[in-house]
Amino acid sequence: MVRSKHMKILAANAQADSSNTEARQSLLFSQSPIPNAESRLLVAGVDEAGRGPLAGPVAVAAVVFDPNKPRINGLDDSKQLTAERREQLYARIVDRALSWSVVLIDSEEIDRINIYQATMLGMRRAVEGVAHVAGFARIDGNRVPKGLPCPAEALIGGDALDRAIMAASIVAKVTRDRLMHELHAQHPEYRFDQHKGYSTPMHLAALQTHGPCPQHRRSFAPVRLALEGREQGSAAIGDPEQLQVAQLVAPL
C-alpha cells in the first residue's frame, strides 16, 4: 500500500494509542481468530469526524465488534457525549473490538481534492484497514465510497442507529480531538485545544489577527478570505452574520 504524506492510518490494534505519532504513520492489522468464512457475517461500522472545521484533518474510523466480548453499554453518537465520556468509551471500544482503524486526511489533501472526496477516501482506507475480518460495511450518511473491498450500505443518521457506527464515530472524534491538542502545542495562538478547529468566534478572531497556519484549510471560505486579506473577507470574519454567508461557500 502506498502511504501518502497527506494520509495517516492508525492501527487496527487494540493496543495502539492514537496519541502516538509513530503509530499514526503506519498501518497495523490485528490478528483475527475468526475463519474467513465466518468473517463474512461481521459488519464494520464507519463514520467520520471533522468535515466542517476550518483547520485540522478529517478523521474516519471503522470498527468491527468482537462477538465473543461483552457488549459495550452507553454507546451513542459522539456529538451527544461529553469529552470525558467519549474517552471512557474509546478505551472500551478499542479493547473489545475485533478490529478497528482510523484514517486522517490532512488539510493539504483536503484542499487538493476537496472535503467530500477526502472523506470518501478516508472511508475507503478505513474499511480497507478492517477488511481482513469484515464482510460488510455500514456507513453513516447517504453515500457509499467507490472501490470498497467489501459490500456496503449507507445509513442516514447511522451514528444514532447502529452500534458499530456509534463506536466508529467515537473513535474518530477522540482521535481527532487528541490530535488537535497536539496541534495546539505547535500553534497555541489559535487555541485548537478549545474549539478543535471549528469556526468559533475565538478561532475567527485568531484568524483575523494571525492569518492562517499550515493546518488551516485554504479551500474553506473564511480561511481563504483571511489569507487574501480582502476587505470583504475581513467583514466576513468579524461579523457573525456575514460568517454564515461565507461558510456557505465552503465545501460541505
Curated annotation (Swiss-Prot):
Pfam families: RNase_HII. GO terms for cellular component: cytoplasm; ribonuclease H2 complex. A divalent metal cation binds at residues 47-48, 140. Residues 41-232 form the RNase H type-2 domain. Its EC number is 3.1.26.4. It catalyses: Endonucleolytic cleavage to 5'-phosphomonoester. Its cofactor is Mn(2+); Mg(2+). The gene is rnhB. InterPro entries: RNase_HII, RNase_HII/HIII, RNase_HII/HIII_dom, RNaseH-like_sf, RNaseH_sf. It is an enzyme of class 3 (hydrolase). GO terms for molecular function: manganese ion binding; RNA binding; RNA-DNA hybrid ribonuclease activity. Gene3D superfamilies: Ribonuclease H-like superfamily/Ribonuclease H. It is found in: Cytoplasm. GO terms for biological process: DNA replication, removal of RNA primer; mismatch repair. The keyword Iron does not apply. Endonuclease that specifically degrades the RNA of RNA-DNA hybrids. Keywords: Cytoplasm, Endonuclease, Hydrolase, Manganese, Metal-binding, Nuclease. Manganese or magnesium. Binds 1 divalent metal ion per monomer in the absence of substrate. May bind a second metal ion after substrate binding. Its main location: cytoplasm. Belongs to the RNase HII family. This is Ribonuclease HII. NCBIfam families: PRK00015.1-3.
